[in-house]
């Protein structure tokens, strides 16, 4: 029998035991994606990197089209390739920085060309550094995101507030923030929290979906556009045909302007 998506199969079998399941995965794309993951796993193994994962999703519906939870080529079982790292919490690194940027743009706390400080910083013994150990003095906010600078983002988080940022992340679909804001502190923006590829892919897909529909809805928003990915064929909902549809609102978690500026920097 075909075994093209073993990690997804194991996940769904555990979540829905004994059920007959139809997924949204496309077999040809699944095989291509898994082959790509396996190829890079072999290439990176010389650097002791043995675990990789990838998701391909339809932004419009959130349907998962390919789900490669880990490398599947024959390998030492001690490397953990049987573990589905799509759903396994990992350090978020710098991947939350665009959400902070968008949140500050939305709230009027920042403009793309506003200068932010990149000088040595110490917060109760926590001294962040940029990846290249260099400080740039003052940089435009959009440059701080493009270069993924650490020090300016820590300053931005201090201004925005950690608890407020956690609420924003949760509202976009992050489910792994289980501790208090005091627990994470300023390190939240530099990987101090764990996230899953599943959540984060859904969050970025939602950002793209909201922005894509902004013109369609003539400057209004549909809260239902913010939702997680699904491994099943998406429910086909009645399309919105009128700008007075009760499902639309003028309020947004993040405005289209904030989303446009943010996504244009990371080329989504």
Give residue spans per PLM region.
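Residue-level preference for non-acidic, small/hydrophobic
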Residues: 33, 62, 95-104, 144, ...
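Hydrophobic alpha-helix feature that most strongly marks membrane-spanning transmembrane helices
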Residues: 69, 100, 104-105, 170, ...
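Conserved catalytic neighborhood of penicillin-recognizing serine enzymes
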Residues: 2-13, 60, 110-165, 209, ...
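A penicillin-recognizing enzyme superfamily signal
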Residues: 23-43, 56-58, 67, 75-85, ...
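Short alpha-helical patches at coil-to-helix transitions and adjacent helical residues
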Residues: 30, 93-98, 138, 146, ...
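Active-site catalytic microenvironments for nucleophilic, acid-base chemistry
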Residues: 39, 103-108, 159, 206-210
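Periplasmic/cell-envelope proteins involved in peptidoglycan metabolism and beta-lactam response
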Residues: 1-3, 7, 14-90, 94-95, ...
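Active-site-adjacent helix/loop patches that line small-molecule binding or acyl-intermediate pockets
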Residues: 21, 25, 49-54, 116-121, ...
């Amino acid at each position: 029998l075909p075994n093209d998506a073993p990690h997804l199969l194991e996940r769904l079998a555990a979540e829905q035991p004994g059920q007959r399941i139809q997924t949204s995965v496309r077999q040809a794309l699944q095989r291509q994606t898994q082959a790509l993951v396996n190829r890079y796993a072999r290439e990176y193994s010389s650097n002791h990197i043995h675990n990789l994962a990838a998701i391909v999703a339809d932004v419009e519906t959130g349907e998962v089209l390919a789900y490669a939870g880990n490398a599947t080529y024959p390998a030492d079982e001690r490397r953990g390739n049987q573990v589905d790292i799509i759903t396994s919490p990992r350090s978020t690194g710098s991947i939350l920085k665009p959400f902070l940027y968008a949140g500050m743009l939305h709230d009027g706390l920042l403009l793309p060309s506003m200068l932010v400080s990149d000088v040595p910083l110490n917060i109760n013994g926590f001294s962040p550094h940029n990846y290249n150990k260099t400080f740039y003095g003052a940089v435009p906010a959009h440059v701080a995101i493009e270069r993924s600078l650490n020090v300016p983002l820590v300053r931005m988080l201090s201004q925005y507030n950690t608890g407020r940022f956690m609420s924003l992340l949760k509202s976009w679909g992050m489910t792994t923030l289980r501790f208090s804001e005091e627990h994470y502190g300023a390190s939240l923006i530099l990987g101090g929290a764990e996230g899953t590829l599943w959540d984060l892919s859904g969050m970025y897909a939602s950002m793209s979906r909201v922005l894509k529909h902004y013109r369609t809805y003539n400057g209004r928003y549909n809260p239902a556009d913010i939702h997680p990915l699904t491994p099943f064929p998406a429910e086909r909902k009645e399309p919105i045909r009128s700008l007075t549809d009760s499902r639309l609102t003028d309020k947004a978690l993040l405005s289209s302007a904030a989303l446009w500026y943010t996504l244009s920097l990371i080329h989504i």
